[in-house]
Curated annotation (Swiss-Prot):
Its EC number is 5.4.3.8. The gene is hemL. The keyword Isomerase applies. PROSITE patterns: AA_TRANSFER_CLASS_3. It is an enzyme of class 5 (isomerase). The lineage of its organism: Bacteria, Pseudomonadati, Pseudomonadota, Gammaproteobacteria, Alteromonadales. This is Glutamate-1-semialdehyde 2,1-aminomutase. Pfam families: Aminotran_3.
Length: 430
């Protein structure tokens, strides 16, 4: 038994399922999860001391790589002044100014401690500002675990939502409408059915929780236009894509302007940080200037702000996103080339520092229903083969992969050589 396996057995005695977030349990791929001891650059190290080239990146935040010296130095310096004050600090002001300078649609921003808090608060604000109750989301998109967002489509994608988790009353879930991602007709159908009741659309501009699904041309702008037509707010959830797809997020990359934006992951530099911001007239509706209540004991924590600012400053380096995109393209297209070489059907998507691969004969994946038809057994086999080769991918066929600036030529080469060997063995076994 490895030390990771022993720790997992020990953890299950005191922690539900042995983990503090379900995907970490490896239920999507089978086997026992790795317990991580440390990380540096492009590598993580498990409790047994084995090194892995990491394409999870703490689920997105580690865009510069693990344990970056500038972020580490900023955190250590901040710790000298205290861990938490529960009062305003200059660091919060600096972070707000940095975010606003990088994302043109954000005129004011409020810090929170997680992506879930950000989306939950943005939706409450949208409901309060519009005085409407219903929200519109998309099947396969994840926006955190707030009750109103853990809703899937019922008997069809255009029906009223049903709870997708026990503990969510149906009377509450009925205010969440679910449309088909990358399908404007499904959105218009709902707006025509509820023309004065929908407060907002919330959308992952690149869906990263059904693997990696970019928007088709015109989709995001179509949502913007419909929100304007029916008086709803457009919330772009950039918790995953913010400062990862481009310096101004996916909204800048695709040229669409939301009313509100939610952020997380990258802005924390590895610390627990979220944020929501947007039009000043909407943000002024939040307490203490407005009637919509939102608060948080650790919001704007000085250690987290210091880590985030150090990372955000580093992301302003010229040419960084072009270099990151080139690394991502090489990995995604390298996986596809190896799969083609060995006669294993695969489709790929990638944008900025995100990528996805799908074991399927479908040429292009643009919707959730296509993702669910992919070959999960092939994914599991590939996953464990890559893990044995020292490459750590997301342990779920429904999660995006992430590159960092720490992934160099050697890491990319080793990863693609490993993929070639694993896919060759899969072809032999089949």
């Amino acid at each position: 038994m490895t030390r990771s396996e022993a720790l997992f057995e020990q953890a299950k005695k005191t922690i539900p399922g042995g983990v503090n977030s379900p995907v970490r349990a490896f239920n999507g791929v089978g086997g026992s999860p790795l317990f991580i001891e440390k990380a540096n650059g492009a590598y993580i190290y498990d409790a047994d001391g084995k090194a892995y080239i990491d394409y999870v990146g703490s689920w997105g935040p580690m865009i510069l790589g693990h344990n970056h010296p500038k972020i580490r130095a900023a955190v250590l310096a901040a710790v000298e002044n205290g861990l938490s004050f529960g009062a305003p600090t200059e660091l919060e002001v600096q972070m707000a100014e940095k975010v606003i300078s990088m994302v043109p649609s954000i005129e004011q921003v409020r810090m929170v401690s997680s992506g879930t808090e950000a989306t939950m608060s943005a939706i409450r604000l949208a409901r309060g500002f519009t005085n409407r109750d219903k929200i519109l989301k998309f099947e396969g998109c994840y926006h955190g675990h707030a009750d109103c967002l853990l809703v899937k489509a019922g008997s069809g994608a255009l029906t009223l939502g049903q709870p997708s988790s026990p503990g969510i009353p149906e009377d509450f879930a009925k205010h969440t409408l679910t449309a088909v991602y990358n399908d404007l007709d499904s959105v218009r159908t709902l707006f025509e059915q509820y023309p004065t009741e929908i407060s907002c659309i919330i959308i992952e501009p690149v869906a990263g929780n059904m693997n990696c699904i970019p928007p088709v041309p015109g989709f995001l702008q179509g949502l913007r236009d419909m929100c304007d037509e029916f008086g709803a707010l457009l919330i772009i959830d950039e918790v995953m894509t913010g400062f990862r797809v481009s310096q101004s997020g996916a909204q800048g990359y695709y040229g669409v302007t939301p009313d509100l934006t939610t952020l997380g992951k990258v802005i924390g530099g590895g610390m627990p940080v979220g944020a929501f911001g947007g039009r000043k007239d909407v943000m002024q509706f939040i307490a203490p200037t407005g009637p919509v209540y939102q608060a948080g004991t650790l919001s704007g924590n000085p250690i987290a702000m210091s880590a985030g600012l150090a990372q955000m400053d580093a992301l302003c380096e010229e040419g960084l996103y072009e270099a990151l995109s080139a690394k991502t393209k090489r990995i995604a297209e390298g996986f596809k080339a190896a799969a083609d070489k060995h006669g294993i059907p695969m489709a790929i998507n990638y944008v900025g520092g995100m990528f996805g691969f799908f074991f399927t004969e479908q040429e292009q994946i643009t919707r959730f229903d296509q993702v669910t038809k992919c070959n999960i057994e092939h994914f599991r086999t590939f996953y464990h083969g890559m893990l044995d080769e020292g490459v750590y991918l997301a342990p779920s066929a429904y999660e995006a992969g992430f590159l960092s600036m720490a992934h160099g030529e050697e890491e990319l080469r080793l990863t693609l050589e490993a993929a070639d060997r694993v896919l060759a063995s899969m072809k032999t076994e089949s």
